Amino acid sequence: MKFSFVSLFPNLMEFYFQDSILARAKEKKLFKLNFYNPRDFSKNSYHKVDDYKIGGGAGLLMQAEPMYEVLRSIQEKKENPYFIFLNPSGKTFNQKDAKRLSKKEHIVFVCGRYEGIDERVLEIFANEIFSIGDFILTGGELPALVMCDAILRNVNGVLGNMESLKEESFENNLLEAPAFSKPFIFEKKNKKFYTPSEFLKGNHARIASLKTTLASCKTKFFRPDLFLEHERKK
């Protein structure tokens, strides 16, 4: 699998893949990375890529010409690129999207800055437009990294144990069940906090049943919207 990032600040992104799980996956050649800076495709002597909006309005906009050129150059490599634009007006990214997109050959994340990208570029290239929530960031780089991380977790071999995906939050519209580590009894300020006793008995069927019950309770409390969806699909 291949990921390309189109960004005015590629150095902000490269470091993310230098440690931990994703670094090991990259070393095993489970995915490849490319970074493209639109400034390298600007035709003016200052490598300028932004200008004022036609019709007025606050802020600057990333111009169509350099954005078109960089994306067209990616297209011409014929690596089956799938263009994803990061924009607050896009649909909210979720776990189902992460699973679906993990089957793509080559995802290109197009990261806007300033007040966004000339709309005509989206009309020409966008396969999908995503947001990660109803809030505004200074650029699309962080959402792109969030999405890339979530997608890669679903690529075979990236996680040490792919079975862990089955127990993670949002599977079957449930949050992941509460998890506990040693010690079995955690004591602070004369208070004792216990691990559920069923977890200590070694009966895997009963533990699995308890985890399902706890996941359901947790979802109902923290995410009633997900819980209703889970109940509807039973």
Curated annotation (Swiss-Prot):
Major subcellular location class: cytoplasm
Enzyme Commission number(s) of this protein: 2.1.1.228
BP term (GO), one: tRNA N1-guanine methylation
InterPro entries: Alpha/beta_knot_MTases, tRNA_m1G_MeTrfase_C_sf, tRNA_m1G_MeTrfase_TrmD, tRNA_m1G_MTases_N, tRNA_MeTrfase_TRMD/TRM10
MF (Gene Ontology): tRNA (guanine(37)-N1)-methyltransferase activity
Oligomer status and interactors: Homodimer.
Protein name (database record): tRNA (guanine-N(1)-)-methyltransferase
Gene Ontology cellular component list: cytosol
Keywords: Cytoplasm, Methyltransferase, S-adenosyl-L-methionine, Transferase, tRNA processing
Role played: Specifically methylates guanosine-37 in various tRNAs.
Highest taxon in the source lineage: Bacteria
Biological classification of the source: Bacteria, Pseudomonadati, Campylobacterota, Epsilonproteobacteria, Campylobacterales
Localization per record: Cytoplasm
Amino-acid positions noted as binding S-adenosyl-L-methionine in the UniProt annotation, renumbered to this chain: 112, 132-137
A Pfam family of this chain: tRNA_m1G_MT
Family: Belongs to the RNA methyltransferase TrmD family.
Organism of origin: Campylobacter jejuni (strain RM1221)
Phosphoprotein in keyword set: no
Enzymatic class: transferase
Catalytic activity: guanosine(37) in tRNA + S-adenosyl-L-methionine = N(1)-methylguanosine(37) in tRNA + S-adenosyl-L-homocysteine + H(+)
Gene3D superfamilies in UniProt: 3.40.1280.10, tRNA(m1g37)methyltransferase, domain 2
